[in-house]
Amino acid sequence: MKAIFAGSFDPPTFGHLDLVLRARSLFAEVHVLVAVNVQKRYLLSECERVDLMRQVLGDRPGVYVFPWRSLVVTYARDVGARVLVRGVRNATDFCQEFDLAWVHRALDAGLETVFLAAKPCYAALRSSMVREVASFGGDVSTFVPRVVARLLQEKFTQA
């Protein structure tokens, strides 16, 4: 069975990677969609985010990374995926993700959403927090893979 894990990944964190790997243990294929949310301003370009996800996930069997600029339900229909995987860190996340699951279900009644609870060590980890720490020159290596930390350092050194 194919599952989709979509996010902006700006930047990808160890929490994101953990969710992808856990989803892969449950599903034959996990399609990671690096999405564009028109309501967000990004630090990293779409190409950088896709490239970073591909680098940190490597050539793991059954894990595929693609950029996506449309509705997730459209991609699901295109590839025959019936499951969306969403990570939740806390009750606030759950409420937001539950609302999103309702929208997905309204658009495609056959699409299920599976919620994976974040591991406790990732429960407070947010990409926005990583960006803020990096913007002040802080060490983000405990939150993101080395390649991501290097790119963030470059971005904020140039700014």
Curated annotation (Swiss-Prot):
Keywords: ATP-binding, Coenzyme A biosynthesis, Cytoplasm, Magnesium, Nucleotide-binding, Nucleotidyltransferase, Transferase. InterPro entries: Cyt_trans-like, PPAT, Rossmann-like_a/b/a_fold. The record marks H16 as: Transition state stabilizer. SUPFAM superfamilies: Nucleotidylyl transferase. Pathway: Cofactor biosynthesis; coenzyme A biosynthesis; CoA from (R)-pantothenate: step 4/5. Its cofactor is Mg(2+). It is an enzyme of class 2 (transferase). It catalyses: (R)-4'-phosphopantetheine + ATP + H(+) = 3'-dephospho-CoA + diphosphate. It is found in: Cytoplasm. The keyword Transmembrane helix does not apply. GO terms for molecular function: ATP binding; pantetheine-phosphate adenylyltransferase activity. The keyword Magnesium applies. Substrate binds at S8, K40, V72, R86. ATP binds at S8, F9, H16, G87, V88, R89, E97, Y122, A123, A124, L125, R126, S127, S128. Its main location: cytoplasm. Belongs to the bacterial CoaD family. Homohexamer. Reversibly transfers an adenylyl group from ATP to 4'-phosphopantetheine, yielding dephospho-CoA (dPCoA) and pyrophosphate. HAMAP family: PPAT_bact. This is Phosphopantetheine adenylyltransferase. It comes from Treponema pallidum (strain Nichols).
